[in-house]
Amino acid sequence: MNYKNIFLVTLLAVPLTVLEVSAAGNSDKLKDTIIDKTIQKFEDGFNSLFTNTELTLEGRTGSDPNFTLLTVNPITEDEAEGNLAFFQGSIIRQNNRDTINLGIGYRQLSDDEKWIYGINAFHDYENTYEHSRWSVGAELRSSAFEINANKYFAISGAKTGKNGNTERALDGYEIEVGGQVPYIPSAKVFAKNWKWDGYQTADTKGNTYSLQINAPIAPNITLEAGTKDFDTGTDVDFVNLTYKIGLGGGKSQQDEMVQSLIADQAFNTTSMKDKMLEKVRRKNQIVIQTSFTASAGGV
C-alpha cells in the first residue's frame, strides 16, 4: 500500500465512521469515536506499508555512518507451487550521497522446503552525481548454508563529481558464502570475494569477512560486524545494526523470538517457507572511482 492509498483509506474512514456512530446522541462521544476510528484506520494502513521493512545503521572506520531504509514485498505468489516474485527497494544515505535501489526477483522453494533458489535484477541510481548501474544475481539458501552471487554493470560513464573531480561508476562482481555457526542457529558467518574493474588503472579487489547475530530475545534486531580485507590498501572494519520496523507476526518470527541460544544439533535444517521474503544480499552502494581510486559510494 503506497502513501496515496493510505491517504484515501484515511479520507474514506471519516464518513464511514460517522455512519457507524450516527445513532449516538452524545456529540462528544461521536467526536471521540470518529477520532479513534480514524486513527486506527490510519495506523492499520501505515503498518501494512512497513510489514517487511528495515532500517540499518552502518558505522565503519574512516567514514561517516550511513543509513539504509529497505523493504521487500511480494508481487505474485503461488504457495502450492512454492514460487514467489517480489520487489525489493531501498534508499541509502552515505557521505552526503543518496542512492536508490529498485529490484525484482524470483524465488523457488524446493519440494522438501529446505532450500530456496533465486534470481534477481536491480537498477541502482545515485542522484547526487547521477551515477547508475544494473546488476543481476543468483542465490541458493538453506537455514544452515547460503551462497549469493552478483554481477554489476556500470551504465552512467564519466561524471563531474565532488570538488569538480571526474568520477565513474565501476563494473564488478561479488561471490559470498554464508554458514550457520555450529550449535548457534541465531549466528552466521559470511565470507565474500569481490573485485571492481578499475578504469585505466588497477582493479580494486579483496575479501569481506563478517559475523551476523539475531538476538533470540529480540528477533527484530540484527547485528553484523566484520572487516573488508583489501588486497592493497588499508583494511576497513564495520558494524551494521538493523531494526525490522514490521515483523508481520509470521510463525517463523514468533519461533525466533523464543528459540534457544544453543541448539541440540550442530546445524539447524528447518523449513525455508517463511524466509521467501528475506532481502537479497548485495552491494547496494555504487562503487565510484575518483582520481583512480575506488571509493563508495565505495567498496
State what each model feature region is.
Residues F50, E77-F86, D111-I119, A144-A149, ...:
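Repeated loop/turn-to-beta-strand initiation elements of outer-membrane beta-barrel proteins
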Residues A23-N47, I155-F190, W196-T201, P216-E224, ...:
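Flexible, glycine-rich linker and terminal segments associated
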Residues N26-E126:
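Outer membrane beta-barrel translocator domains of Type V secretion systems
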Residues L69-N73, L102-Y106, A121, V136-S142, ...:
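Residues on the lipid-exposed face of transmembrane beta-strands in outer-membrane beta-barrel proteins
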Residues M1-S22:
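Gram-negative bacterial Sec-dependent N-terminal signal peptides
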Residues L55-G59, F87-R93, I119-Y125, V136, ...:
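Transmembrane beta-barrel strands of outer-membrane/channel proteins
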Residues L57-F67, I91-N101, Y125-S132, D197-N207, ...:
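Solvent-exposed loop/turn segments connecting transmembrane beta-strands
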Residues S135-E167:
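A charged, solvent-exposed segment within the mature domains of Sec-exported extracytoplasmic proteins
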